[in-house]
């Protein structure tokens, strides 16, 4: 575990100040399943969703929409997923109630759609996609933010950080197989803290979850505030 933050960087309260828009901008690469969409929760359900769960998922959709719009204020957003593009589009509408993903000018890159028919091993999909995206945008961006729930994918991004030091690359590790409230809390937390992450060249972990008196009230922290894995 790396060093703790100095007091002025402690994330005990939301930061509302927006970062200055950079000339070359910021690119967000955000996973879909269990990062924006509560995929594990709905696929592991053996019974139909209750009305409360449906309403929670719609609430998640509203928060995801706000988060994506917030990210778009700072740069370009790409949903980078191993699922199909049709899955992203259908679940965004049918579950989250988000009908304007494309209208938001958010690009969806499906590694499954791009590489499966080419016979490329799945373990290389994200790495190949990342290289292609970087080659396209490297002269247009200053900051790259990668958000994902997969430790394997986060490790791919970390390797990429070491090879490409001309760009500020930060990763955000979401919890694996979150329930709906967990995902809502994670994304709401990022909405108010994303400005701190941009341009930091660090790896952030949303790991620790402590349950409060209200069973629906969770308090999230970045692992030991910040887990500084990357270093020069």
How should each PLM-predicted stretch be described?
Residues 1-32, 40-53, 204-207, 213, ...:
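Non-catalytic pre-domain segments flanking phosphatase-related domains
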């Amino acid at each position: 575990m790396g060093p703790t933050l100095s007091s002025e960087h402690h994330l005990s309260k939301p930061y509302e100040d927006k970062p200055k828009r950079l000339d070359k901008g910021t690119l967000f690469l955000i996973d879909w399943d269990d990062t924006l969409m509560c995929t594990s929760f709905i696929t592991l359900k053996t019974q139909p969703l209750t009305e409360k769960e449906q309403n929670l998922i719609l609430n998640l959709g509203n928060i995801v929409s706000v988060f994506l719009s917030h990210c778009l204020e700072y740069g370009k957003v790409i949903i980078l997923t191993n699922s199909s593009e049709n899955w992203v589009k259908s679940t965004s509408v049918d579950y989250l109630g988000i009908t304007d993903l494309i209208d938001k000018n958010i690009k969806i890159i499906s590694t499954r759609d791009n590489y499966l028919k080419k016979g490329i091993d799945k373990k290389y999909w994200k790495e190949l996609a990342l290289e292609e995206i970087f080659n396209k945008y490297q002269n247009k961006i200053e900051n790259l933010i990668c958000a994902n729930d997969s430790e394997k994918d986060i490790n791919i991004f970390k390797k990429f950080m070491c090879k490409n030091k001309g760009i500020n690359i930060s990763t955000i590790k979401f919890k694996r197989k979150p329930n709906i409230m967990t995902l809502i809390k994670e994304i709401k937390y990022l909405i108010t803290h994303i400005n701190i992450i941009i341009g930091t060249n660090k790896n952030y972990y949303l790991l620790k979850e402590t349950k409060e008196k209200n069973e629906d009230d969770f308090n999230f922290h970045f692992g030991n505030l910040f887990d500084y894995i990357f270093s020069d």
